Each structure stands twice: as C-alpha cells, then as structure tokens.
C-alpha cells in the first residue's frame, strides 16, 4: 500500500451577505446562528481547490498502477483546531462564539455558472484577506482586512457567483442547494472531530476524465442548520487551512495498492499462473508504449 498527498492550491471562507475575504487566514471558522459581530444572523462556508498535478502525473506515468479503480481511494483530511484539548468542549471562543456540537457538515462540488450557454466554470481567486472583521485601529491601512474577491458575492474583480454564496439554502435562488453535487456528509457529535470526507468517486472521475474543468469544492452546514432561527448565540467550529504554520495543513490522501505479487515461485500446471514483466533501459525501469507479447 502506498500513499500520495495532494495539498490545497487555494482556500477561503465566505460569510453570508458580507464582502469580507479571509483567504490568508490559517483557520477557517464555520459558524451559524445569531451573530452581533458581523451580521444580525449569519453563517459561513469554506471553499477550496486541490492541486492534483502530482497525482495526475503519477497515474499517467504508470507509477500508480491501479488506475481509477476501487484499489485507489481518496480522503480529504482537515484538522480541527479543538482536537488537541478536551477542555475546549462546551466553551466559547475569544469572540464569544460557542463551540458547535451535534451537527453535520457536507462536502459539495462548486458548480459551473449555468446562466451562460454553455455553462462556464466559476473560477475564483483566493484573495489577500486575513481578519474576519475589520480591526478598530488608528492605522490608515489595515492590511489584515480585505473586501476584495473572492467573497460572498464575487469570484474575481469583474465576475460574480451565479448565486451569492454559491447556492441558496432556501431553494429560492438562481442556483439552489437541491441542485448541488454533494460528495459526502459527516456528523460531528462533540465538535472536536477532524474532517475525513470520502472523495474517492469524485477524484477518480477527474482522473479518468468524467469530470472536466473542476474549480474546487465547498464545506458547509446543512441548510436546516444555517437557517435556524431563535438561537441566542453563535456556534462555530474551526479547522486549519493551507496557510497554517503548523504540521496540520489540510490535504487529500490517496491510498493505492501497488503491491506486485506473481507466481514465479509457484508456477505449476493445471492452474492460471501470473508473471510480471520488468523492462529496463540502461539500468532503469521503463514503461512500454504498448502491451508486449512474450513466449515461454
């Protein structure tokens, strides 16, 4: 069994009805509920893209010999910022938000813009923002806060999402939740669990060409949670992003079975025997352009 790790190429947290960009923040804070900090009621969603170039190269070069089969699996791993200390359970953050418990997060593919013919990929920029709110500082230019794209409304300076926030959680917009391609859903009982979404079918479909021009994925609370009313506070969960300066950078882990076993030591009559051919050129392994014919 071998492992290949693919890392994020960009990520951002977008905030309901807000132009704030947090692309450079080392933590994504997914929250819902009453929020006097940013909005009277709000929630956030996390978007990201993965650099699959090394994995694609390994598949094309035959290093990953399994092909896009069940022998190759892909899991998205993100570390919870509360994972390390159980004392964080049932407490609040420095901003006064309660740590969320008993909730589901789902992983979805960012859809194309279906208002164009043909539909066009919604290619978004990560942005240069850091803070979730503008700091009250006498410094004229707060370089940690930015309202430049991407954000809830815009993907670039001149382009917007087909639907603000990517989709409508009330199914009343130009692109709705019930039209999303949901990849996986995970339940969080205590709120300190790590993310481990299964992306096997999704990534294999990209590798075999079934999915073309992907522009990334998103993570969000279920619409029923985002739309909760009557809450007396804000509830949040945090995960490390690609900008963390720690070991806990998020990644896609690919596991593939490249164990080669044949019957060279048990080659007998009366059964199907398997042999592997190793081809060398100047002492190095070489891939063939076509299947060879061998006479025994």
What are these regions (language model features)?
Residues 1-296:
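Secreted, disulfide-rich extracellular signaling modules
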């Amino acid at each position: 069994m071998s492992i290949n790790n693919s890392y994020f190429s960009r990520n951002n947290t977008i905030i309901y009805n807000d132009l704030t960009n947090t692309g450079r923040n080392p933590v994504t804070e997914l929250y819902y509920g009453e929020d006097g900090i940013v909005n009277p009621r709000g929630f956030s969603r996390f978007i990201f893209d993965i650099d699959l170039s090394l994995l694609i190269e390994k598949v094309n070069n035959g290093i990953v010999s399994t092909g896009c089969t069940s022998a190759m699996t892909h899991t998205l791993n993100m570390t919870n910022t509360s994972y390390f200390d159980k004392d964080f359970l049932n407490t609040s953050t420095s901003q006064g938000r309660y740590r969320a418990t008993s909730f589901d997060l789902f992983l979805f593919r960012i859809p194309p813009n279906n208002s164009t013919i043909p539909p066009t990929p919604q290619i978004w920029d990560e942005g240069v923002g850091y803070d979730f709110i503008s700091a009250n500082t006498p410094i004229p230019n707060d370089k940690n806060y930015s309202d430049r794209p991407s954000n809830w409304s815009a993907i670039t300076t001149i382009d917007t999402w087909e639907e603000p926030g990517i989709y409508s959680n009330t199914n009343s917009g130009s692109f709705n939740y019930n039209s999303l391609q949901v990849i996986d859903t995970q339940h969080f009982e205590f709120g300190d669990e790590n993310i481990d979404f299964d992306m096997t079918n999704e990534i294999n479909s990209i590798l075999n060409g079934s999915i073309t021009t992907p522009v990334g994925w998103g993570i969000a609370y279920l619409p029923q949670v985002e739309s909760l009313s009557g809450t007396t506070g804000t509830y949040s969960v945090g995960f490390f992003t690609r900008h963390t300066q720690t070991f806990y950078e998020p990644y896609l882990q690919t596991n593939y079975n490249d164990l080669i076993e044949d019957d060279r030591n048990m080659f007998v009559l009366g059964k199907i025997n398997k042999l592997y051919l190793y081809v060398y050129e100047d002492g190095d392994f070489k891939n063939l352009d076509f299947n060879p014919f061998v006479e025994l």
